[in-house]
Swiss-Prot record:
Its main location: membrane. The keyword Transmembrane helix applies. Residues 342-578 form the ABC transporter domain. Involved in lipopolysaccharide (LPS) biosynthesis. Translocates lipid A-core from the inner to the outer leaflet of the inner membrane. Transmembrane domains (TMD) form a pore in the inner membrane and the ATP-binding domain (NBD) is responsible for energy generation. This is ATP-dependent lipid A-core flippase.
Amino acid sequence: MSINTDESTWRTFKRLWTFIRLYKSGLAVAVVALIINAVSDTYMVSLLKPLLDEGFGSAESDFLRTLPLLVFGLMFIRGISSFVSTYCLSWVSGNVVMQVRRMVFNHYMQMPVSYFDKEKSGSLLSRITYDSEQVSAATSQALVSIVREGTSIIGLLVLMFYNSWQLSLVLILVAPVVAWAIGFVSKRFRKISKNMQTTMGIVTSSAEQMLKGHKVVLSYGGQEVEKSRFDVVSNQMRQQSMKLITAQAAANPIIQMIASIAIVVVLYLASVDTIKDQLTPGTFTVVFSAMFGLMRPLKALTNVTSQFQRGMAAAQTLFALVDLEPEKNTGTYSVERAKGEVNVKDISFTYEGAEKPALSHVSFDIPRGKTVALVGRSGSGKSTIANLFTRFYDVDSGEIQLDGVDVRDYELKNLRTQFALVSQNVHLFNDTIANNIAYAAGDKYSREDIERAAELAHAMEFISKMENGLDTMVGENGASLSGGQRQRVAIARALLRDAPVLILDEATSALDTESERAIQSALDELQKNKTVLVIAHRLSTIEKADQILVIDDGSVVERGSHSELIEKDGAYAQLHRIQFGEG
């Protein structure tokens, strides 16, 4: 178990090193500065021998006169090296964390929709924020301690053995015990760190859930429920933190106690006549001071074990994430602009983990420039069909063709440029209205194009009344706009894209009747040269569709034009009567 853990840590560090070595120049400068810092400390201890053996023994000693300048010089060098090492390692660490965050963020954007269906958004955010920051502990604080304290230990050991190898041999007996203690503590830190990462994700998810649903919380008086829920996860985080602190607090005195045994033995041996005769006051003081000085770096290395293991545990979690298979993009077919003919051939689809298929043997065609509407009760599978068009999910059987080519054979990015999507769940970015509209068009637009799209979507009616017009910031997810205004901005975004296939998933559901009429006139104009799939709740918006499909329980139960389906007096006619209060 321990061997596997050590191997895992080593593999993780090697992967992390691929990021660190990008900044090896800064790292090299920092390491040199740390070594100079440690050597300065060791040399300061070595000055005790000539000071005691020669300096105080001779009134004419030049050593005493030069000592103040020597000490000042050492402290100056130590100060400069400390600043350089701290700055350079912070620079390296900051860049490494930035690269790791970019890696995770970029991989998120390549993951399939099904991955986000399963993961809590709070946990995903925690990996970019908390876990990435923990990597900094392994690339800055930990490295500082490992290099500086490691060099100090080596320097002090050399100094001790040089002055009295007999007394220094005691450390050989103590060293294995110290090494075992540090190894034991490392494994404990690693386990606790992993638990802390998981708990931090839960804390973030709980807070995010409340913040996003604060209106629901206030409306239904759920403050106590949310408070109780957050208290539980916060306490779990506190418990994990206390476990880490307890392990760290216990490790320091244990290692110091082990080291103190060596000091006690040295004091005893120094009193033995055969050894005492070989010692001068300076020699004994140097050896004893060096041995006592080992306590600080040993304690620091114990503390850094906690930091290093937290960083390794976080890095392991992040690397496990980026090792997940991204969204499949095996298609190679590409076209600048599709004609827009869509054929759905006997498709079936089941969501991961679901027992019942969302769609079962669905077939229909949308000729170029025609409009097909999907209607049916909630959960019947209408939006699932739209998601399959753009390959947010892949069909289990059957195929969807665009211009006679299976959508799975298209290069994924190229396929999605052929579609413009407006759903009932509008997402706007914390940016200006203009940039939100232009988001769909990349850099292929002008200011006039944005204004024209906003005009067609009847968005300029409210935009023109704003002080900054199109340059108005909309807030997080369009918080400063009403539901209808957000919907019109989203429609303007789709209009600007000018894709050959338009998907309207309850696109007018958030609009009042007057706004809906205005939007519908713009959409009627837009649909003249485009293939359109409309998913609608309001049947009044799809009466002009070339074909209407009634979806129920994942299957097509009726199809035809509005008049044909009314005349048939089946499921569609029943929906129509319910919605319009007829009969």
